[in-house]
Amino acid sequence: MAVFRVLLASLLISLLVLDFVHADMVTSNDAPKIDCNSRCQERCSLSSRPNLCHRACGTCCARCNCVAPGTSGNYDKCPCYGSLTTHGGRRKCP
């Protein structure tokens, strides 16, 4: 019976330590959010379909927390933004 109590206590302590480590990792990964609305307004300023462009840009910005600079191209500045694709394999982000 004593062995069972020691085993149970060590298991609970291990779980508690893992919970603290996980909580520390979650709070340390918070990056500051950018203003997607203004970045996408700039990105879509020359688009022939500004509403569609702004919606797609906003989705990409929310996922990647960055928007490629300028009105087109420059996907190398934000690799996540440039790598998102639609189901058809086309670029999702304007």
UniProtKB/Swiss-Prot annotation:
Keyword list, A-Z: Disulfide bond, Gibberellin signaling pathway, Secreted, Signal
PTM comment text: Six disulfide bonds may be present.
A Pfam family that the UniProt record links to this protein: GASA
Primary subcellular site in the record, as a coarse category: secreted
InterPro entries: GASA
GO annotation, cellular component aspect: extracellular region
Location(s) in or outside the cell: Secreted
Keyword hit for Calcium: no
GO biological processes: gibberellic acid mediated signaling pathway
Signal peptide span: 1-23
Functional note: Gibberellin-regulated protein that may function in hormonal controlled steps of development such as seed germination, flowering and seed maturation.
Family: Belongs to the GASA family.
Protein name, UniProt field: Gibberellin-regulated protein 11
Naturally occurring in which organism (per UniProt): Arabidopsis thaliana
